[in-house]
Design a protein with these regions (language model features):
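Long, charged, low-complexity intrinsically disordered regions
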Residues: 1-62, 69-132
């Protein structure tokens, strides 16, 4: 179990250090936000799954999930601990890091989602034009 002030850090193999650093520092524009305050664990899990599926469908890659620090929950940081665990189980989640203070600090996480096949192709084509 995490503590209210603990940071959440998770990065899949293959995620470039520069990409992870940029996420950790809050440098990517936040494209969507989910607030889990006042939700039960079951409601929160359902909301997280639904939210991330919607984001993936809409080609949204950078989101913030506000879970709260859980200072008054019993046990402390219960929601935070579960959110950290759930996100690692979702294969479309590339990396996760606790947010900067201006986005919620240790009561929120940045989530970077996998790029769609379409977006990967666009990036590849853009780099090909630049190189060739």
């Amino acid at each position: 179990m995490l503590k209210p002030d603990d940071f959440i850090e998770f990065k899949r193999d293959g995620v470039q250090d520069g990409v992870y650093r940029k996420l950790r520092l809050g440098k990517y524009p936040i494209q969507a936000r989910l607030d889990l305050h006042r939700k039960t664990l079951k409601e929160a899990r359902d909301e997280v799954v639904k939210f991330l599926k919607q984001c993936i469908k809409m080609d949204i890659r950078t989101v913030v999930i506000v879970h709260g620090r859980g200072e008054r929950s019993n046990p402390p940081a219960l929601m935070k601990s579960f959110v950290a665990s759930w996100l690692q189980q979702i294969r479309e989640v590339q990396c996760v890091h606790s947010a900067q203070r201006f986005h919620g600090g240790s009561g929120a996480v940045y989530v970077l989602l996998r790029k769609s096949a379409e977006k990967k192709m666009e990036t590849r084509e853009r780099h090909q034009k630049r190189l060739g």
